[in-house]
């Protein structure tokens, strides 16, 4: 199960995609609870400094907790996601989907910073999942998915 915490840009889209994201979690990790938490630029910068020693904001950070009630948490900064979307000539919605799936794969044990083989497999899976979910969502967007609130 996925819980979307935090409000603002992206929260409605993630709620609309929750079922598909839960399928990925179940396939990659199992029947576990994952929190996706939308945070400000200052909050993600503080977390990045505290846990990675990087004094800058980032788009996504993943923390495996492996507790009984929550397996892990994925922190996402919509502002940085939006900046990256512009930089990579992507839509905000697709970039948001990419970072959340990226976080899910990190929770599943994939690592792209230290293992080349694992990195290749991770990004191949990420691309496959993004295309599957994005394609389905684009062909059947929910009636209540207001682009201004996604």
UniProtKB/Swiss-Prot annotation:
Protein's UniProt keywords contain Nucleotide-binding: no
Locations listed in the record: Cytoplasm
Enzyme class: hydrolase
PROSITE patterns assigned to the protein according to its UniProt record, in alphabetical order: UPF0054
Cofactor note: Binds 1 zinc ion.
SUPFAM superfamilies, A to Z: Metalloproteases ('zincins'), catalytic domain
InterPro entries per the UniProt record, alphabetical: MetalPrtase_cat_dom_sf_prd (IPR023091), YbeY (IPR002036), YbeY_CS (IPR020549)
GO MF, one example: metalloendopeptidase activity
Functional summary from the UniProt entry: Single strand-specific metallo-endoribonuclease involved in late-stage 70S ribosome quality control and in maturation of the 3' terminus of the 16S rRNA.
UniProt name for this protein: Endoribonuclease YbeY
């Amino acid at each position: 199960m996925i819980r979307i915490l935090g409000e603002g840009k992206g929260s409605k889209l993630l709620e609309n995609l929750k079922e598909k994201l839960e399928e990925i979690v179940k396939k990659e990790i199992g029947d576990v609870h994952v929190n996706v938490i939308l945070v400000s630029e200052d909050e993600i910068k503080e977390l990045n400094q505290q846990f990675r020693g990087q004094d800058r904001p980032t788009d996504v950070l993943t923390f495996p907790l492996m507790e009984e009630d929550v397996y892990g948490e994925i922190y996402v900064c919509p502002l940085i996601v939006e900046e990256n979307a512009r930089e990579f000539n992507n839509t905000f919605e697709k970039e948001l989907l990419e970072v959340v799936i990226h976080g899910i794969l990190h929770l599943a044990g994939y690592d792209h910073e230290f293992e080349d083989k694992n990195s290749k497999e991770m990004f191949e899976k990420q691309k496959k999942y993004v295309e599957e979910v994005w394609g389905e969502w684009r062909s059947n967007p929910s009636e209540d998915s207001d682009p201004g609130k996604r």
